[in-house]
Amino acid sequence: MGDNYSTYLLDIEGTVCPISFVKETLFPYFTNKVPQLVQQDTRDSPVSNILSQFHIDNKEQLQAHILELVAKDVKDPILKQLQGYVWAHGYESGQIKAPVYADAIDFIKRKKRVFIYSSGSVKAQKLLFGYVQDPNAPAHDSLDLNSYIDGYFDINTSGKKTETQSYANILRDIGAKASEVLFLSDNPLELDAAAGVGIATGLASRPGNAPVPDGQKYQVYKNFETL
């Protein structure tokens, strides 16, 4: 089913790891840190340059604005940058490990060309794949899958995931023909956008994913073992 492709483009949440990981682990970890980040911000702090880009001087208003962006899941590039900074500390301190599916780990290791495309920043993507919970080891052990991944794309490098032009940009950047690429995601709007430039698509059907209307029109993958 997936043997006809030389290149694979993968979504993250709901595709290679549970969709709940972001909303139940990453987002709460970030929002719990926001008050401290804002209240302790100084000109010399590492986050000062990021927070200043919001152009909100009042700390209470700034905190409320950031939390509102998170609550509404707004794909704001400044927010993504701030989240990347906070999550880096979480991963590096061992407080966060990414629960990547075992079949996805095996898939990434055995395929020659694998690229990642997520609305999360490239920095956040590299952190996630750098601190993967090892399914065959104790809870404190982690895997670094970054050496198996050929490249990363986000909304800043390529555009929104629901826009066809974004996938044309990715094809250009990786030097591949559309017919050589299979894109896997749990979001049908993203699949339709990729199909607009001729990329083959597959709908990831993982536990906890939202039901997809007209799902029968997509090639469905419950895991990556058949690829």
Curated annotation (Swiss-Prot):
Task of the protein:
Bifunctional enzyme that catalyzes the enolization of 2,3-diketo-5-methylthiopentyl-1-phosphate (DK-MTP-1-P) into the intermediate 2-hydroxy-3-keto-5-methylthiopentenyl-1-phosphate (HK-MTPenyl-1-P), which is then dephosphorylated to form the acireductone 1,2-dihydroxy-3-keto-5-methylthiopentene (DHK-MTPene).
EC number, as in UniProt: 3.1.3.77
Q: In which pathway does it act?
A: Amino-acid biosynthesis; L-methionine biosynthesis via salvage pathway; L-methionine from S-methyl-5-thio-alpha-D-ribose 1-phosphate: step 3/6; Amino-acid biosynthesis; L-methionine biosynthesis via salvage pathway; L-methionine from S-methyl-5-thio-alpha-D-ribose 1-phosphate: step 4/6
GO BP annotation list: L-methionine salvage from methylthioadenosine
The root-end lineage is: Eukaryota, Fungi, Dikarya, Ascomycota, Saccharomycotina
What is the protein's name according to its record?
Enolase-phosphatase E1
The primary gene name is: UTR4
Subunit annotation: Monomer.
Tell me which species this is from: Saccharomyces cerevisiae (strain ATCC 204508 / S288c) (Baker's yeast)
Q: Please name the top-level EC class of this enzyme.
A: hydrolase
Listed GO CC annotations: cytoplasm; nucleus
Q: Where are the transmembrane segments?
A: none
Q: Which residues bind Mg(2+)?
A: 11, 13, 186
Annotated PANTHER family? ENOLASE-PHOSPHATASE E1
- What InterPro entries is this protein classified in? Enolase-ppase_E1, ENOPH1_eukaryotes, HAD-like_sf, HAD_sf
> What further fact does the record state?
Present with 2850 molecules/cell in log phase SD medium.
Which metal ions or organic cofactors does this protein require, according to UniProt? Mg(2+)
